[in-house]
Amino acid sequence: MYSDLSKYFADVKDKSAHDVCEFIGGKVKQNDFKNCCAVRMSYAFNKAGIKIPFTENKTVSGEGKKDWYIYRVKDFKAFLNSKNYKKYTTKQNSLDDFDNKTGVIVFDVDWEDATGHVDLFNGKSVEGSDYTSQSKSITLYEIN
């Protein structure tokens, strides 16, 4: 499953937030989110067959209204918790505790415009943007 997530995440991980919104279309495009990490992850999950469910005030539809996209990190964390993935949390500014584990990594950071960042972890490093040094805590949801 992780390999599928990584494959589809590659479609959007290097795009700007604006370009991600354009690529997905629909209400995602209309909102033109400035922070798109949860939208990027929603895209990967939807394409990998782990569908994001509609949740009022927490998801928006893409082009064609067949897939739903979470746009806040805190709501993506709630989605991950609902899936009962094994999770590991560290308060250290290090990813050593996650060596050889793959899955979704969540950085809890107090930014003015976001509560954190969600990305993929390949067992050694973060696939997209790594905010280890800025995090209060880091959680890995293990997906093999």
Where would I find each of the regions flagged by the language model?
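Weak global preference for isoleucine
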Residues: 24, 50-52, 70, 105, ...
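Active-site-proximal beta-strand/loop segments in catalytic clefts of secreted hydrolases
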Residues: 44, 107-110, 143
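...with weaker cross-activation on analogous glycine-rich loops/strands in unrelated enzymes
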Residues: 59-131
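Residue-level marker of intrinsically disordered, low-complexity segments enriched
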Residues: 26, 37, 102-104, 116, ...
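Glycine-rich, aromatic-bearing surface loops/beta-hairpins
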Residues: 125-144
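N-terminal capping segments
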Residues: 1-66
